[in-house]
Structure formats: structure tokens, C-alpha cells
């Protein structure tokens, strides 16, 4: 068995071992270097207890982004402020934070609430402190109010996080996104579960339960469908499933391997790995007509296709050079060019949404880690420091990578920032979780 075949067998074995569905995020590195920000509890202007804590969600989002660290509310000079009108610059003169998030929540009819929030520029406030009277409204970076229903608190909290993140970084936030992943609970009649959840593990939903392995989930560009590989019929088949209607479509069921689906940027086609003509090769399948087009032709294994953002090329893993490496094939000319040369193996690659970086699994000295290559300079940086890393998936804003890894002998999910500075682990209770796929913007 050659090296790539052994790797594919290892991935299959890993995917068929034990899992828990609830995901938590434990930050392991990178907090000290993050940008400080203050988030105070939103003031509840109604009777009885507040229906939800928006500030807790916003603070957690910003901390998990790897860009910010939220300050302890107990150490803030004004922890009950609700708007810039109650802001006193002198009180914040010695607080090391660049911005402050404040807000209010009040009843607005049956099961509805008016949520207001403001983003205050603390840097500007501190520069102006001591210069006499000032107009606090000049300190506002953002101010919004929205009416939401009782079941929208968490969703709108993520929306606030998106707004704050983009205002302070210039990069669109990805807190309203979701992840898909595979859970395996051994001992059950149908131990293989295809799950989706909010990016932070909340609002988990099971899409499919099967007695046979499920693997390789991938999102459509519109975020409405998932493609995945199922062995429910005792053979590898590729399905596309609408996550809202639950409608499933069988796309590929040839003899042999049907694997590694990847949606084209227009959502109309899948790049897949098929062995119907002999060796595993890269094909493109039209989802509507099921028509197939062979893209590669080589005696070595070609697998793990991934599209470039312009839809004109496909990245894939091949052993045609003797060891697993990443290659690019043009869909116009079928010309193949090698992309990676450092390390022993490089595989499982994908291109960042902006087309500037390639994320992949690198094996050096027998250790598998997540790596990033700048496509302009070809500089490679190893991002992760965990073990047996696999299945990297990039956030739609290109700032974070979620991937599968091993922690204390169990398969778990982990995350790392694109600069490698911030690291987090998504621990589980019983069983294992793997094969993560980050959704597009929703």
C-alpha cells in the first residue's frame, strides 16, 4: 500500500471511531497579544429578570475571534452604563482598551424586545480627557437599535459581534456562521451522525444518522446544502442534502471510490474523487444532470479536490511525485503544476476566500500539522502545535481555521488563527468529533 493510500485508510479508520455533540471552545494560546476591549452588561429596562445576556455572548464572540480579549467587567470603572450619554471619559482614562460596547434591552410588545447598542471609542476619549467639555456623541463608532423576538437573542448577539468586529478591524465578522461535523457514538445502532451547529457549538442539529460511516461534509456557497459521503448502502456514495427541507439527492454512486466532494463557487457542480475508470482521479460532476467530466489522468492517486475562488482551477492531493503533495490543475487546459515542496507530505489543501493563501496538512518529521502558504511569496508557516491534525476548513472571512486533531487520545476539533498566534480547542465529553466544515456567510 503506498503512502497516500495509507493516509486515506488512516482517515477512514479515524472517522469510524467513537463522539459527543456539544462543543465548547477553550482558548489555549494567544489571549495576551490580543487587542483589549470592554463589554459591559446591557441594561434591562423591564420588569423581572432580563430575558437573556447579550453582553455575555458578545464578549465570548470577540474573545474567540483571536483578535480581541475582553476585560473583566468587575475591573471596569462603569459597569452599568447604558449609552454614551452616561459615559465619563475621566473614569476611563487609565483603562487599557480601545473600545467599549454598551446597550439596553426593553420590552416592545408581546414577545418582542427593543435592543440598542453603542460602540464607544475609548482611545479617542482618553486623548480628549482633560481638555474641557466634549461632545460624547463624537465618541460613537457605531449605534444601532433593532426589534427582535424572544427567540432571537443569541442570533442578534452574534450580529452585534459581527458589527463590532468589522468596525474595529475592517474585516467582516463570522459569528453568524455555522459548522458541520461528523459525530460517532459507538454502541448505538446508528452511531454515525452528521451534525450542524452555530460556530460556537450552540443550536446543534442532527441532519442524518446512519449505521455506516459518514464523512467529508462540505457546504454549498449559499449555505443551504451540504454534500457528504455516506456508506449507508454499504458502498461509498455522494449525497447533497438541503439543510432546511432535508431533501437528499444522490449525486454519485459509481463502482469504487466516490469521495471528497467540493462545491464549485457557483454551487452548480461538485469536484469529486472517483475510481470508476481505474485509479482515483479528480472529476467534476454537474449536480443537476449528473454529467461527469474527468479532470486528471495519472497512474498515481489523485484525491481531495478543492476549488480556487475564481472557479477556473482545482487544488488536489497527488502522489505523482512519489509522495503526497498539492497540485493545481487548470480546468481550461488541464495543465497541472505542483504547489508544495517543503516537508515530507502536504495534503488536504484549500484556498482562502480571498485567494491569497493555501491551507493544508503538512507532515514534517512524521508530525501532522496545519500549515499556511502565501501564494504570492510561497512562504509556508506551520500554524498548529497539536497532534495528528487533519481536515482544515477556513472561516469565510479568512481569519481562522477549524480542523480535526487528537487530544488526550481522542479525536476533537481545534481552531487556529491564520497567523498562528491564537489557538483554541473544542473539547467533547464522551466519544469523538471530526471532519469540520465551516459554512459561508449566512
From Swiss-Prot:
Pfam hit, one: TolB_N
GO BP terms, alphabetized: cell division; protein import
GO CC term, one of those recorded: periplasmic space
Signal peptide: 1-21
Localization: Periplasm
UniProt keyword terms in alphabetical order: Cell cycle, Cell division, Periplasm, Signal
Family: Belongs to the TolB family.
Matching PANTHER family: PROTEIN TOLB, PROTEIN TOLB HOMOLOG
Role this protein plays: Part of the Tol-Pal system, which plays a role in outer membrane invagination during cell division and is important for maintaining outer membrane integrity.
HAMAP family: TolB
NCBIfam families for the chain: propeller_TolB (TIGR02800)
Quaternary structure annotation from Swiss-Prot or TrEMBL: The Tol-Pal system is composed of five core proteins: the inner membrane proteins TolA, TolQ and TolR, the periplasmic protein TolB and the outer membrane protein Pal. They form a network linking the inner and outer membranes and the peptidoglycan layer.
Name by which UniProt lists this protein: Tol-Pal system protein TolB
Species assigned in the record: Shewanella frigidimarina (strain NCIMB 400)
Encoding gene per record: tolB
Amino acid at each position: 500500500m503506498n503512502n497516500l493510500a495509507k493516509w486515506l485508510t488512516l482517515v477512514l479508520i479515524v472517522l469510524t471511531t467513537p463522539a459527543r455533540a456539544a462543543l465548547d471552545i477553550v482558548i489555549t494560546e494567544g489571549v495576551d497579544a490580543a487587542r483589549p476591549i470592554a463589554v459591559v452588561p446591557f441594561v434591562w429596562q423591564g420588569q423581572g429578570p432580563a430575558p437573556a445576556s447579550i453582553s455575555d455572548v458578545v464578549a465570548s464572540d470577540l474573545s474567540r475571534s483571536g483578535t480581541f480579549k475582553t476585560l473583566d467587567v468587575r475591573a471596569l470603572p462603569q459597569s452599568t452604563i447604558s449609552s454614551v450619554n452616561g459615559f465619563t471619559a475621566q473614569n476611563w482614562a487609565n483603562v487599557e482598551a480601545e473600545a467599549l460596547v454598551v446597550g439596553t434591552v426593553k420590552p416592545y410588545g408581546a414577545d418582542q424586545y427593543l435592543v440598542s447598542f453603542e460602540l464607544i471609542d475609548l482611545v479617542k476619549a482618553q486623548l480628549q480627557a482633560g481638555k474641557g467639555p466634549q461632545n460624547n456623541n463624537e465618541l460613537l463608532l457605531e449605534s444601532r437599535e433593532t426589534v427582535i423576538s424572544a427567540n432571537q437573542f443569541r442570533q442578534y448577539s452574534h450580529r452585534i459581534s459581527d458589527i463590532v468586529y468589522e468596525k474595529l478591524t475592517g474585516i467582516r465578522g463570522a459569528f453568524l456562521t455555522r459548522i458541520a461535523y461528523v459525530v460517532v457514538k459507538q454502541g448505538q445502532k446508528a452511531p454515525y451522525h452528521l451534525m450542524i451547529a452555530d460556530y460556537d457549538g450552540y443550536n446543534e442539529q442532527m441532519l442524518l444518522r446512519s449505521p455506516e460511516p459518514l464523512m467529508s461534509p462540505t457546504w454549498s456557497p449559499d449555505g443551504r446544502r451540504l454534500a457528504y459521503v455516506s456508506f449507508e448502502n454499504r458502498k461509498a456514495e455522494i449525497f447533497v442534502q438541503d439543510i432546511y427541507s432535508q431533501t437528499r439527492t444522490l449525486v454519485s454512486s459509481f463502482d469504487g471510490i466516490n469521495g471528497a466532494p467540493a462545491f464549485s463557487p457557483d454551487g452548480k457542480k461538485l469536484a469529486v474523487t472517483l475510481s470508476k475508470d481505474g485509479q482515483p482521479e479528480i472529476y467534476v460532476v454537474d449536480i443537476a444532470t449528473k454529467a461527469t467530466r474527468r479532470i486528471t489522468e495519472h497512474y498515481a492517486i489523485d484525491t481531495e479536490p478543492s476549488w480556487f475562488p475564481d472557479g477556473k482551477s482545482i487544488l488536489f492531493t497527488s502522489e505523482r511525485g512519489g509522495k503526497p503533495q498539492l497540485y493545481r490543475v487548470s480546468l481550461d487546459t488541464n495543465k497541472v503544476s505542483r504547489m508544495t515542496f517543503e516537508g515530507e507530505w502536504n495534503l488536504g489543501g484549500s484556498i482562502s476566500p480571498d485567494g491569497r493563501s493555501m491551507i493544508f496538512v503538512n507532515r514534517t518529521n512524521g508530525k501532522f500539522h496545519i500549515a499556511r502558504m502565501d501564494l504570492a511569496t510561497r512562504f509556508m508557516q506551520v500554524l498548529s502545535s497539536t497532534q495528528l491534525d487533519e481536515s482544515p476548513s477556513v472561516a469565510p472571512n479568512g481569519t481562522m481555521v477549524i480542523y480535526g486533531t487528537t487530544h488526550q487520545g481522542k479525536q476533537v476539533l481545534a481552531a487556529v488563527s491564520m497567523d498562528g498566534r491564537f489557538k483554541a480547542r473544542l473539547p467533547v465529553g464522551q466519544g469523538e468529533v471530526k471532519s469540520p466544515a465551516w459554512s459561508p456567510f449566512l
